[in-house]
Swiss-Prot record:
GO molecular function (one): rRNA (uridine-C5-)-methyltransferase activity
Active site residues per record: C421 (nucleophile)
Record protein name field: 23S rRNA (uracil(1939)-C(5))-methyltransferase RlmD
Keywords of the record: 4Fe-4S, Iron, Iron-sulfur, Metal-binding, Methyltransferase, rRNA processing, S-adenosyl-L-methionine, Transferase
Purpose of the protein: Catalyzes the formation of 5-methyl-uridine at position 1939 (m5U1939) in 23S rRNA.
Disulphide linkage map: none
Record-linked SUPFAM superfamilies: Nucleic acid-binding proteins (SSF50249), S-adenosyl-L-methionine-dependent methyltransferases (SSF53335)
UniProt catalytic activity: uridine(1939) in 23S rRNA + S-adenosyl-L-methionine = 5-methyluridine(1939) in 23S rRNA + S-adenosyl-L-homocysteine + H(+)
Superkingdom field: Bacteria
GO biological process: rRNA base methylation
Amino acid sequence: MSEAVPLSTPGASHAGAATDRAPVLDIDSLDMEARGVGRAVDENGEPGKVIFVEGALPGERVTYSSFRRKPTYEQAQVVDILRPSVMRTRPKCAFFGTCGGCSMQHLDMRAQVAIKQRVLEDNLWHLAKLRAEAMFAPIHGPSWGYRYRARLTVRHVAKKGGVLVGFHEKKSSYVADMTSCEVLPPHVSAMLVPLRRLVEQLSIRDRMPQIELAVGSQVTALVLRVLEPINAADETLLREFADAHRVQFWLQPKGPDTVAPFYPLDVQLDYTLPEFGIRMPFKPTDFTQVNHQINRVLVGRALRLLAPERGDRVLDLFCGIGNFTLPLARLAREVVGIEGSETLTSRALANAKENGVDGHTSFASRNLFEVTADDLHALGAFDKFLVDPPREGALAVSKALAEIAQSGEGPLPARIVYVSCNPSTLARDAGLLVHEAGYRLKGAGVVNMFPHTSHVESIALFERD
């Protein structure tokens, strides 16, 4: 047996070689939480429990320490790596393994993307008995400094010498003592320590539990969740910090609807989709994609797959602030955007006017988790659908399309592009679209929207004759 390899691994202890008491395990695969998966062997050489090992990679032989035992499986963390994987790499971030923001920095980027592609394929097969006719090339881009949205926890910790501002520690309610972050844009990472110092000076430092940040093309917004009003001295400190770091402060005293800009007032968050000549203003609490560079590529691919023509009528479901709706309106005759949030549909309408495509768009607010075949009928006939649901997926929409197909009572879109942030709900909905609504799964592929995490974003194309 080879010597233990002291590599940087989340949760690992590398005080020395593996002891005789630490069990040894060969890792076969990764699960959806980026844990190594292997099967223990009992004293008779027979397969035993499945072991999920944090910090282990496929192809590795490790020793491990279990922290949760169940009849059929155990959860564990790496103790030592006896045979490292060729996919293992040294994490760039000094706080990896403690901070819960990333789970895959120890895995080569190409391997990260390949594993996510396999997760997508496995979900489609195991949950829906489907294989795509083609697997699209993965969409990927910069792997560092990409995270343009984040929610940071603020905690006054006397034992740490003051205020902490950062992500939670891995599987913990504690806040990581982080002074930089490699996945945040460099200017935001450099702001973490000054932000701590700012909060320490505020009168409400122990009554401000959260800071939400959103990076736009011209300004970075920081939303302070304030449980009590700030005083005049606080206002001065915030203005000075905003001027020094070129940020805009917003205050949120209660729920999301209470968010309002504080200072400065003459700037506006936005992002752009240059390929389609779109400028998209948004509020810092609106849903927008975390990774602006990848979003541009994703929108371009989605529209090329959907292939809208000038005479087409297109339905954009879960349209948000118009991320796909507005580019579609540059190409199609009419685009109807449906979204569950009235706030977001109002923003989408304003954005359509801002970009001069309001003559080709209309928007409505509907609960798409309860939509029926009758609801789709009432909207009229559409040539194509674009569907971009949250993690819960588009079950009601898929069921409604299946019902229409089986009843033969209405036209169905010839093509559907489905953008997913959860491969299991995509697979579930794909099963309905293919097995019950008569579509073919023409292609699918991953979108590496969140490098160094186990999050799997994907895109799929369905067609029906």
